Amino acid sequence: MATAASNPYSILSSSSLVHADSAGMQQGSPFRNPQKLLQSDYLQGVPSNGHPLGHHWVTSLSDGGPWSSTLATSPLDQPDVKPGREDLQLGAIIHHRSPHVAHHSPHTNHPNAWGASPAPNSSITNSGQPLNVYSQPGFTVSGMLEHGGLTPPPAAASTQSLHPVLREPPDHGELGSHHCQDHSDEETPTSDELEQFAKQFKQRRIKLGFTQADVGLALGTLYGNVFSQTTICRFEALQLSFKNMCKLKPLLNKWLEEADSSTGSPTSIDKIAAQGRKRKKRTSIEVSVKGVLETHFLKCPKPAAQEISSLADSLQLEKEVVRVWFCNRRQKEKRMTPPGDQQPHEVYSHTVKTDASCHDL
């Protein structure tokens, strides 16, 4: 006994003693895997083979004795990390509080480990992730693993266990969406069609003599949607979004049909236009006519009334239209000319002093 007490490692290094006790330890319940045996015997001080070896168990395993060589390999090929004294003290507190849960040891499922359990008590899942649960005699957790939900159920089982309302239904909406999309594509105009319609609408509106404000007011009275002059202007300039262009196109098309059918007779559109803003219709001048007027403006920015009348007759325009155009052109020239510079009519007044046709109206 003195020799055994003085040299406890000789007891652990004896292979015959290990093999002799292994059969008995597999049958008896007090012996479990090495780490559990270390923790329980270290805490309770229960002699395992007649010798109080609480501290010597820790020292022998941490120094890499014969048992550590048999437990060095792991099915996951993980490094063999032995717990220190502080870890064992922490494990003691957890062991007293909850006998079911403790720190995971990589040697739990080793084939050579003592008291190795079959598959139901395995602490490693199919995905290779370890669980922080190991089995203990008297505190079995096999029922907890099987019925408590610690092991995640298969994907098929979890899907079947869901309520029919919570299950993800088969995506039948894609076929319907494609069908509706094909149907809507037949009615939705393309960008080229919208551009062509906007161009034709502007030409026919000017030809009929309606302003953009008249069109917006007529749409509000006839169809219940009031549109401003800015909206009609942006439609003609293709500055609206594609969605709004598609919504506005059928309304403007109906307005054109109504306006074409009512040409020459006072209809609701004419009455609506008369009830609108009391102002003269905006006059549109062609590019060629503007070129002729620009040429005359460079020669004489302030033409006489007789010259305005002859110019209006030659261009087939009203006299008032020509007069207003020259007035607007002079105002534009003032805005474009920096202060201090001579304006065109001042330059011409110095060069042509005897021209009687150039004087103020």
From Swiss-Prot:
Entry-annotated residues carrying Phosphoserine: 265
GO cellular component: nucleoplasm
Signal peptide range: none
GO BP terms in the entry: cochlea morphogenesis; forebrain neuron differentiation; negative regulation of mesenchymal cell apoptotic process; sensory perception of sound
DNA-binding region: 278-337
Listed Polar residues bias regions: 119-131
Protein name: POU domain, class 3, transcription factor 4
Organism the protein comes from: Mesocricetus auratus (Golden hamster)
